[in-house]
Amino acid sequence: MAEEKVLNWGICGAGKISNDFCSAMMTLSRYEREHKITAIAARSQEKAQKFADIFEAPKAYGSYKDVANDPDIEIVYIGVIHTEHVRLSMMMLEAGKHVVCEKPLAPTWQECKKVLDYAKEKKLLFLEAVWSRFFPVYDAIKDEVNSGNLGDISMVTTQFCIPIMSVERLCRKDLMGGVLLDIGIYCIQFACHVYGEMPEKIIATGSLNEEGVDEDGCVILLYSGNRKASLVYSGKTASGNNTATIMGSKGQIFIDDCFWCPKSVKLTDTTLENKIPEGPSPYNFYNSGGLRYEADHAFKLIRSGQLDSPKYGYKDVEMIHKIIDEISKQIGLKY
């Protein structure tokens, strides 16, 4: 390719996370040369137009199908409720669009596999947007783990506790609610980031609400060589000190609150920081400016012809969702 043309984005969903993604993407130093928010789609034309006006998108659609049919759009960000993730991902892939879909892609590995296999068949990029993996400090964490500076790593701990069970989409079974898919997935991805393999054994416990969706969980992942990960997450407690630690025989890495979207990380001999700038539209979630990194990563993958991310690729989706499947089985979580 002679030059890197602008990547035209279609945005499905005009809610909080889509706002944060668009606002964060616009903070990229090369935004105007590499990215363009071309179209917004929502469940109503009015809502789509209001969102489009905020981000100066030239097109607003009251139907997601219109995004699929728009020939100007090369990539689609899916930021709707996750009960729609598989359907819309398949729709956009069928239309020949690359896809960045908010997590969780689906409640089961088999449903995730259906989407990934179709993306491979269509020779298109598909990213499940576990945004943690695209933060520069997560690269630094992986490099430090692989360097040997920590010695033999034998323990990983994470905690993610915030009072969110009053949120409608999380407390209802028909909306595939629960905290495992919402915040527990961040704890799981962190352990997988460190160890890079499936655990040999999983021990999980959690409590379900009256509708049968999970409100909290404690999970132990047991790996070969007596290595372990201890994961704690809850949607019904007061906010905790939501940190993560990697412990080795020679040293440790500490990631302060919020470990899934950290502003900084304390390595064995230095502290590294991310740039998390404010965007043109106020953010709704912690450190949402970091969403800029997944947008930038998608651009680089597409323009270099890579269809599987080295930071969070198909093997990572498989590993994490197979662990989710086993945890769901053990705690009695069924959709």
Task: Tell where the protein language model's regions lie, with residue ranges.
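Active-site loop of classical SDR/Rossmann-like NAD(P)-dependent oxidoreductases
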Residues: 43, 282-296, 312
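C-terminal helix-rich "cap/oligomerization" subdomain common to oxidoreductases
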Residues: 1-6, 75-77, 224, 297-335
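Contiguous beta-strand/loop segments that form the cofactor/metal-binding neighborhood of enzyme cores
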Residues: 3, 189-262, 290, 296-306
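N-terminal Rossmann-like dinucleotide-binding module
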Residues: 1-55, 333
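Predominantly a Rossmann-like dinucleotide-binding segment in NAD(P)-dependent oxidoreductases
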Residues: 132-205, 210
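Hydrophobic residues in well-ordered beta-strands that form the structural core
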Residues: 61, 101, 126-128, 157, ...
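Rossmann-fold dehydrogenase core element
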Residues: 114-131, 151-156
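Beta-loop-alpha module in the N-terminal Rossmann-like domain of NAD(P)-dependent dehydrogenases
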Residues: 55-118
